[in-house]
């Protein structure tokens, strides 16, 4: 269905964790995405006029998904793209170069979720970041979503690959401001929040 989204894991406190808010400088790293990543990594999603959403990425649980996301971020793929689908009380979805839910990157990746034969215990609770996809379980490419409210009905069908550690207030504000034109959360192109940059910090 078009209600595509993802899977994140147990969120503890998403609004405060090892982040010095007085430090406005971002240090980026260049990870080797020629092979699957492992371990925990972090990204900063800068949203124009809103601020930065800090995300922890779990490459031990979803190595293909995290490696793909990091690769695209490091290539600048997401720079200037938008959140084109916003549903208050559900999620925000972005990362489509077409800005309407029909686009993606050049390649699709395997869906890392249980109903596709992959163990993934990241539940779609508030703050989870997950991959959007079409009906094909292996159709995810660049579009991702961040869960605003617990949506565990997505568990097993979408590849959660991390969680927000700081910035859920920004997600809430984006949802609050959104004026979708239909029940599917479609946002007019001139009103879509802009992803200025996604920086991989470690």
Feature annotation, model-predicted:
Residues 1-9:
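Single conserved hydrophobic/aromatic residue that forms the stacking wall/gate
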Residues 10-42:
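N-terminal, intrinsically disordered, polar/charged segments of Gram-positive cell-envelope systems
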Residues 48-50:
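Glycine-centered tight beta-turn/hairpin loop motif at sheet-sheet or coil-to-beta transitions
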Residues 53-135:
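Internal glycine-rich, Lys/Arg-flanked active-site/core loops of soluble domains
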Residues 91, 128-132, 141-174:
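Active-site scaffold segments
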């Amino acid at each position: 269905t078009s209600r595509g989204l993802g899977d994140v894991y147990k969120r503890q406190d998403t609004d405060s964790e090892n982040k010095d808010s007085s430090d406005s400088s971002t240090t980026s790293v260049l990870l080797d995405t020629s092979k699957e990543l492992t371990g925990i990594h972090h990204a900063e999603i800068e949203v124009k006029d809103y601020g930065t959403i800090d995300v922890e990425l779990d490459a031990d649980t979803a190595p293909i998904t995290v490696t793909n996301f990091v690769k695209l971020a490091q290539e600048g793929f997401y720079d200037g793209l938008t959140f084109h689908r916003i549903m208050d009380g559900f999620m925000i979805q972005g990362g489509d170069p077409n800005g309407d839910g029909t686009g993606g990157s050049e390649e699709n990746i395997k869906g890392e979720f249980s109903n596709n034969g992959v163990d993934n215990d990241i539940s779609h609770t508030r703050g989870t970041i997950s991959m959007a996809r079409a009906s094909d379980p292996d159709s995810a490419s660049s579009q991702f979503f961040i869960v605003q409210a617990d949506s565990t009905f997505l568990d097993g069908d979408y590849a959660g690959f991390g969680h927000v550690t700081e910035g859920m207030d920004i997600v809430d504000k984006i949802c609050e401001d959104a004026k979708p034109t239909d029940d599917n959360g479609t946002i007019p192109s001139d009103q879509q929040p802009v992803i200025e940059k996604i920086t991989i910090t470690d």
